[in-house]
């Protein structure tokens, strides 16, 4: 459960992302594909080279979903229900991949905002991304 302080930290961190959200989403995906090559199996029809239009487009989808989640921290299941259905029933993404992408997103945020990435902010973002991952995998059961 996210505390009021966690929610404030997440909102402040995401506000600093600003107009770079789609780029950070794409960068996090690129990090995920490079660090965990098995994640590429879900994108056989994509050009997965760094900077590809398809990776950028999917990075924007990731960023848009996270922006929606940041704005709906009090109702993540409601905000992410359709996305959970999609990943569980149609795409059948292995739930571990959400944790891998979350880790790469944390690395991306830390790389771009090192001064703002305090231990408290890191912990809050980690809890938030874990909550998002839990919601996205909730329809698997």
Curated annotation (Swiss-Prot):
In-chain residues carrying the UniProt-annotated modification Phosphotyrosine: 24
Annotated binding of O2, by residue: 58
Domain (Globin): residue spans on this chain: 1-141
Tissue note: Red blood cells.
GO cellular component, one term: hemoglobin complex
Keywords associated with the record: Acetylation, Heme, Iron, Metal-binding, Oxygen transport, Phosphoprotein, Transport
Any GO BP: hydrogen peroxide catabolic process
Record PTM Phosphoserine, positions in chain: 3, 35, 49, 102, 124, 131, 138
Annotated positions of the N6-succinyllysine modification: 7, 11, 16, 40
Pfam families: Globin
Residues binding heme b: 87
Keyword Nuclease: no
Residues bearing the modification Phosphothreonine: 108, 134, 137
Residues modified as N6-acetyllysine: 16
Gene3D superfamilies: Globins
Disulfide bonds: none
InterPro entries tied to this protein: Globin, Globin-like_sf, Globin/Proto, Hemoglobin_a-typ, Hemoglobin_oxygen_transport, Hemoglobin_pi
MF term (GO), any: heme binding
PANTHER family: HEMOGLOBIN FAMILY MEMBER (PTHR11442), HEMOGLOBIN SUBUNIT ALPHA (PTHR11442:SF48)
Subunit annotation: Heterotetramer of two alpha chains and two beta chains.
Similarity annotation: Belongs to the globin family.
Function: Involved in oxygen transport from the lung to the various peripheral tissues.
Full protein name: Hemoglobin subunit alpha
Species assigned in the record: Suncus murinus
């Amino acid at each position: 459960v996210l505390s009021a302080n966690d929610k404030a930290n997440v909102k402040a961190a995401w506000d600093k992302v600003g107009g770079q959200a789609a780029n950070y989403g794409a960068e996090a995906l690129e990090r995920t594909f490079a660090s965990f090559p098995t994640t590429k199996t879900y994108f056989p029809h994509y050009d997965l080279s760094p900077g590809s239009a398809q990776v950028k487009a999917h990075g924007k989808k990731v960023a848009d979903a996270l922006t929606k989640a940041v704005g709906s921290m009090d109702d993540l299941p409601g905000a992410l229900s359709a996305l959970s259905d999609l990943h569980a029933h149609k795409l059948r993404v292995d739930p571990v991949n959400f944790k891998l992408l979350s880790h790469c997103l944390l690395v991306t945020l830390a790389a771009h905002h090192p001064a703002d990435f305090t231990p408290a902010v890191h912990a809050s973002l980690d809890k938030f991304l874990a909550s998002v991952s839990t919601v996205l995998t909730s329809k698997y059961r």
